[in-house]
Curated annotation (Swiss-Prot):
Metabolic or biological pathway: Purine metabolism; IMP biosynthesis via de novo pathway; 5-formamido-1-(5-phospho-D-ribosyl)imidazole-4-carboxamide from 5-amino-1-(5-phospho-D-ribosyl)imidazole-4-carboxamide (10-formyl THF route): step 1/1; Purine metabolism; IMP biosynthesis via de novo pathway; IMP from 5-formamido-1-(5-phospho-D-ribosyl)imidazole-4-carboxamide: step 1/1
Pfam families from the UniProt entry: AICARFT_IMPCHas (PF01808), MGS (PF02142)
Phylogenetic placement of the source organism: Bacteria, Bacillati, Bacillota, Bacilli, Lactobacillales
Native source organism of the sequence: Leuconostoc mesenteroides subsp. mesenteroides (strain ATCC 8293 / DSM 20343 / BCRC 11652 / CCM 1803 / JCM 6124 / NCDO 523 / NBRC 100496 / NCIMB 8023 / NCTC 12954 / NRRL B-1118 / 37Y)
Alphabetized SUPFAM superfamilies for the sequence: Cytidine deaminase-like, Methylglyoxal synthase-like
Protein name: Bifunctional purine biosynthesis protein PurH
Length: 508
């Protein structure tokens, strides 16, 4: 007689699976609530305390933590001395363990959950049984996922439970218990940067490929999902999101979260292409499109208001990969869904992104930092020039600062209030970004109102000089260079407003 031990929190699929095991000749052993469910279904089941000859105790905290259980799991069937020892102590081998764990994750997601409630939902016996079974996978089938029940039954019936399949189930167990423990560790940890960093993610999607066709890829969600994420967006129309789609859409969502005003953000290769605001969404679109009507092709568009028909008509004429918005009117959806390859996503928008750790892979490890969520406000500005800013210039500088923090360094943004005019991204030296952004901006309507924002300080006064000589009248930068005095002097010489924000926004 082969023996299966079942102890599950998630009862889905349990009864038909258990009945199949009985038909296959398994003797069932179970614990607590699982035992009751199986008995109520009319199955013959041995209670765990009949196996251990010891009652459950401490409010169920101790049920399966017993040598008669773990010896039955860990004994190697290919070692005569192991089997002899089981016989000596009259221990029956256990050939299958079916366990899923206390719902710690769903418990800590409940509003108002206490630490005591969370701790009571930390499973001890379940992971112990799973790990014992997984270690001895050559002899014991460890099953942690109800989705595997049908596959296991079919393989048992066909006699196809080979070593490779057993090994895959064992790997799944250790992945599951590691993720479970990581979730607990992160819940209990009170420091952002512990000595041992444990991260829990769950597969969201197998992707066609990564950044390029020769790179395999998958997407994973954090074990405790964030509501404001492209991975939680509803895909109303279009095919599966690609790796690059997800990265670009994420960049767009981060930028548009900076603004409460009606705003449209366009993104290409994770850099903003154009950003516009207006009294209506259509007007905001017009501003964003005019900001860079070339780079937008093949790009991502994020809008923080419901998409109406008028705006949809204008977007329909352009090749776009994704449009993401809180919602679409029926008319707007009909217009845009006519484009087969356009992906339409909905996601409730927010201007409050929670502070979390950002993890970046490097060869041999990761670097970890808190998100750059410093709010931009003219209250943080210090005017260091003799020239004083106008109200309109201050508003434009706040707008530009919210953009420049999302541009790859060295980053320069030329903008007027409510519209970017030129964006210089990713240049190895700052003056090149200054030159490029101004060249993009200077022939556009509204350049006479333009201000310039820099993500980091100017190491020399050449950026101030170039900007002033090409029509920029107000500049905002963090300050902090040993040559700040040179930049201030140049601004005063040329009559330019120079403001220090006090906050650097490098982005690599």
């Amino acid at each position: 007689m082969t023996r299966a031990l079942l102890s599950v929190s998630d009862k889905s699929g349990l009864i038909p699976f258990a009945k199949n095991l009985v038909e296959l000749g398994y003797e069932l052993v179970s614990t607590g609530g699982t035992h009751k469910v199986l008995i109520d279904a009319g199955l013959d089941v041995i209670s765990i305390d009949e196996v251990t000859d010891f009652p459950e105790m401490l409010d169920g905290r101790v049920k399966t933590l017993h040598p008669r259980v773990h010896a039955g799991l860990l004994a190697r069937r290919d070692l005569p001395e192991h089997m002899a020892k089981l016989a000596e102590f009259d221990i029956t081998p256990i050939d299958m363990v079916v366990v899923n764990l206390y719902p710690f994750k769903s418990t800590i997601q409940k509003e108002g959950v206490t630490e005591a409630e969370a701790i009571e939902n930390i499973d001890i016996g379940g992971p112990s049984m799973l790990r014992s079974a997984a270690k001895n996978f050559a002899s014991v089938l460890p099953i942690v996922d109800p989705k595997d029940y049908d596959v296991v039954v079919n393989k048992l019936k066909a006699g196809e439970v080979d070593r490779e399949y057993r090994k895959s189930l064992a790997a799944k167990v250790f992945q599951h218990t590691a993720s479970y423990d990581a979730l607990i560790a992160n819940y209990l940890t009170e420091t952002s940067f512990p000595e041992n960093l444990t991260l829990a993610y769950e597969k969201f999607d197998d992707m066609r490929y990564g950044e390029n066709p020769h790179q395999p890829a998958a997407a994973y969600k954090t074990a405790l999902p964030e509501a404001y994420s492209v991975l939680n967006a509803d895909i109303l129309h279009g095919k599966q999101l690609s790796y690059n789609n997800i990265r670009d859409a994420d960049a767009a969502l981060r930028i548009i979260a900076e603004y409460e005003e009606t705003t449209v953000v366009t993104v290409k290769h994770m850099n903003p292409a154009g950003i516009g605001q207006g009294q209506t969404l259509e007007a905001a679109w017009d501003q964003a499109f005019a900001a860079d009507d070339i780079s937008i092709f093949g790009g991502i568009v994020a809008l923080n208001r419901e998409v109406d028909a008028a705006t949809a008509e204008k977007m329909h004429d352009i090749f776009l990969e994704i449009i993401i918005a809180p919602s679409f009117t029926p008319e707007a959806y009909e217009i845009l869904a006519a484009k087969k390859n356009l992906r339409l996503l909905t996601l409730p928008f927010t201007t409050s992104i929670p502070q979390k750790l950002e993890v970046t892979s490097v060869l041999g490890g990761v670097v970890v930092q808190e998100r750059d969520l410093v709010g931009e406000s003219e209250n943080n500005f210090t005017v260091v020039s003799k020239a004083q800013p106008t109200k309109e210039q201050l508003q434009a500088m706040v707008f530009a600062q919210k953009v420049v923090k999302h541009v790859k360094s060295n980053a320069i943004v030329v903008a007027r209030n409510g519209q970017t005019l030129g964006i210089g991204a990713g240049q190895p030296n700052r003056i090149d970004s200054v030159v490029y952004s101004i060249q993009k901006a200077e022939k556009k309507p509204g350049f006479d109102e333009a201000v310039l924002a820099s993500d980091a300080f100017f190491p020399m006064d050449d950026s101030v000089q170039y900007a002033a000589e090409h029509g920029i009248k107000a500049i905002v930068e963090p300050g902090g260079s040993i040559k700040d005095k040179d930049s201030i002097a140049k601004a005063d010489e040329l009559g330019v407003v120079l403001i220090f924000s006090g906050t650097r926004h490098f982005k690599h």
